[in-house]
Amino acid sequence: PLARTNAFGLVLYPGTSTPGSVSFGAWAAKGNNLTILDYAEARAANESGRLSGEELLEVERNVMPGSGTCGAMFTANTMSTIAESIGMMLPRGASHPADYEASSPMHADVRSQAKASVDALYRLIAAGIRPLDIMTERAFENAITTVYAMGGSTNMYLHLLAIAREAQVPIGIERI
């Protein structure tokens, strides 16, 4: 809605979930590095009879033990990277964890980003700088380059084109 309404605002990302762990099979060797990608592998192993239903449930329960988005470069992490590279999120806002191994409700980096974002928003309001002043054609080109460099989700085509249209920035599929 920021591109559509041009209302003062910034994006704040909650962070990425801490990886989990389980104590059986090939996943035990990963230690505390179980991610959403491992769930897909576990699901296939279950469907082929190599993993029991109970083990699949254990992987499912532990793949994202805390808050935040999945720990892979899928849509949420790609779009947070776009928000940062387009200028609508503070630097380093797309790259912090959401929590500490699910033992804390919020990672200190998230709290710090929230406070810094509010402070920055007040400065933007005082200066009269709105989202469409930030979301320029050059900012979109920066976002496209960043996503390609990081190997982001192909969903970015849909989302970036929609945001560009709302921001009235002439970026079409041929430029992405």
Language-model features, listed with the residues they occupy:
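Hard-cation-handling environments
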Residues: I176
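Active-site cavity-forming subdomains of large catalytic enzyme subunits
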Residues: P1-N142, V147
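Alpha-helical support elements that line or immediately flank enzyme active sites
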Residues: L158-V169
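Short, well-structured active-site flanking segments
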Residues: G172
